[in-house]
Each structure stands twice: as C-alpha cells, then as structure tokens.
A protein has these predicted regions:
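C-terminal motif of bacterial Sec signal peptides marking the signal peptidase cleavage site
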Residues: 18-21
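Bacterial N-terminal signal peptides that target proteins for export
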Residues: 1-12
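Short, surface-exposed polybasic-aromatic patches that bind anionic ligands, especially phosphate groups
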Residues: 30-330
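Bacterial signal peptide processing site
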Residues: 23-26
Length: 330
C-alpha cells in the first residue's frame, strides 16, 4: 500500500466565479436538488448540461446540512486553521493563464491508449480514452501533480491519472497512478487503494465547474479540499490515507466539513453564493495533502477572479465537521 502520497501545490491567488448569466442575483433561491439533465457536451471544460456524476444516493451527492456534527469538530477545524481563509484553487488567470484541475469530455468512440503506471498494484489497468488534446494540470511542462481527467459521456465513465506524461512519439502515456470510475455506480475502490488522488477518491466530482456555477446556477455535490496535515486514517468514502501522524485531532482523509448554516452569505456576489450554498448543503471532502482550506475547481478563462477572491474572507471557524463513520487506521 502506498502510505505517503503527499502533494503540496502552491497555487496563489484565489479566484471565484461570476454568474454573468444570473442577472442581478437578487433572488436567494439557489437550487439544492438536481433538475432534468441534458446530454453533456464535448471537449475541454465542456458542460455536463446538468448531468450529475454518480447516483443520487452517492456520498458526493448526499446533503449533509441536517447531519449531526462530529463531537471532535472544534479540535479538527482548529488543526486546519480557524483564521485561515477559504481559498479557491482555480480561476481565469495566474502566471499567464487559467489555473486549476482541467478536464475533457469525450465521446464513447474515442480510442483507448495504453498507460504504464508507477503504482500499478493500486491502479486500474485497461485502455484510457485520452485524446491528443487532453489538458494536463499545470500545463505540459509542469512538474506538479499533472492530473489528467477524462469523462466518457456515452459510457458514463471517468478516467483519471496522477503524474501523467505522454510518451514521446506515441499516443500512449505513463502515470504515477490511475483510476477508472463508473459514474452510474456507487462502487468504491478496494480498501487501502489510492487513485489519482491521495484519498483514493475521484477528483472530477468534487471540482467547482463553470458550467454548474454559471449555466446551472447551482453546485449540487460536495467539493474537494486539501489540508497541510492529515491523519494516518481514512473514513468513507475515502479508501486511502497519506500520513504517518496518528493524532486524533488531525483530519482523516474523507472527512467532510460543511459551512455553518448560520454563516451569512447575503453580501457575497451571486457566483460566490452558489459555491457557499453548496458548502452549506453538501460540504467538502478532504481528498489530499496540500494548502489548508484550498478548494478545487476547473480552470476556465470565463471565471471572474475578482468574484472568486471574495471567498477568501470565509474563515476556517465558519466550518464544522460532519459526524464521521468508522475510521480505518491500517
């Protein structure tokens, strides 16, 4: 088992999205349940047209606003940071271009390619339908996590790679690890397995995406976030830990936090309110080691970074831990 896949990414400025399509944003009635979805588009940053990954009863899609708080919530939140602000780790422009974790939507006829894994014993074998145009997190010359996320809209499957590199002169790839998820199933990875993420979770379902925030006007799932220190333990839906720290006051992978219902979001711009409402209703799940309170999203030149930056004013003290299930420590 891979015990340490610690990934620290320092992506500066936080950015938040704009709801250009939401008019004045005078209405506070943000949807909290899915409507009738359409057929997802194709390409980089393609809209899913309201289609939500995984069944409605999946952990990512389960509302937690009425769930009990964990009895150790105060200590766990303090260990991440009471005064540190929320930080959207995505946006329209930083260092000459958009930043975040990109994705691409492909059709079911996209040819599969071979991927060679460093951690093959915890990676899913098989052909991965990675198009030539597939974006790499951080860009083709980056040295960071280099995630590659591919959604097959017709077979409704998700393919994810960590530390992905195209093989020169070939259509094939190498990667640190990889995972394939059936988006119509609740199946988890084997216990103790990593994925393209440290916690053994899928990445794509936890991203803040432009099509949801702006086109749909609602984010109807939990989000993905990171913390600089985690525990040598995990809780469902996570399947893997990435730390040797055994303190009960450190957050385990898979821990879910939510924005307190009493936190006033009325002064935030419309796009920020959509994201904050998602954090109240669905919360966010600890998925990797990284900068404290960084939430993940897809890069897009259409984001309004000024609006995204308003999220930085939300302190860690505004969150609480949702009651956790059984901790897995070995």
């Amino acid at each position: 088992m891979i015990e340490t896949m610690t990934r620290f990414i320092s992506v500066p400025a936080l950015v938040l999205c704009t709801l250009a399509a939401c008019g004045s944003g005078a209405s506070s009635a943000i949807p909290t349940a899915p409507g009738q979805p359409g057929k997802p588009g194709l390409g980089i940053n393609a809209s899913l047209q309201g289609r939500r990954p995984f069944p409605d009863d999946n952990a990512w899609n389960t509302p937690v606003d009425k769930a009990s708080a964990d009895p150790n919530s105060d200590a766990l939140i303090a260990s991440i940071g009471l005064t540190k602000g929320l930080h959207p780790d995505f946006g329209a422009s930083y260092g000459g271009g958009p930043f975040g974790i990109p994705y691409v939507v492909v059709s079911g006829s996209t040819p599969g390619v071979s991927v060679t894994f460093d951690y093959a014993d915890e990676s899913d074998p098989g052909a991965y339908p990675i198009p030539v145009s597939a974006p790499i997190e951080g860009g083709s010359s980056s040295s960071g996590d280099r995630h590659v996320l591919v959604v097959d809209r017709d077979h409704w499957k998700l393919y994810e790679l960590y530390a992905a590199y195209p093989v020169a002169g070939s259509v094939n790839w190498t990667a640190g690890s990889g995972a394939i998820f059936d988006l119509s199933s609740d199946a988890l990875r084997p216990a103790g397995w990593t994925s393209a993420d440290a916690a053994g979770l899928p990445i794509f379902p936890g991203l803040v995406r432009y099509d949801e925030v702006v086109e749909q006007g609602a984010v109807l799932h939990a989000l993905r976030f990171t913390a600089s220190h985690s525990r040598h333990a995990y809780v469902a839906p996570a399947r893997h830990y990435a730390s040797s720290d055994t303190s009960s006051n450190r957050p385990p992978m898979g821990m879910r936090v939510r924005l307190k219902g009493t936190f006033d979001v009325s002064a935030f711009p419309p796009s920020a309110r959509v994201i904050l409402q998602a954090l109240k209703t669905y919360g966010m799940i600890l998925a990797d080691n990284g900068s404290d309170w960084y939430i993940s999203g897809a890069p897009d030149t259409r984001w309004n970074d000024s609006e995204l930056n308003t999220l930085k004013t939300v302190p860690g003290s505004a969150f609480e831990v949702v009651a956790m299930g059984t901790l897995v420590k070995n």
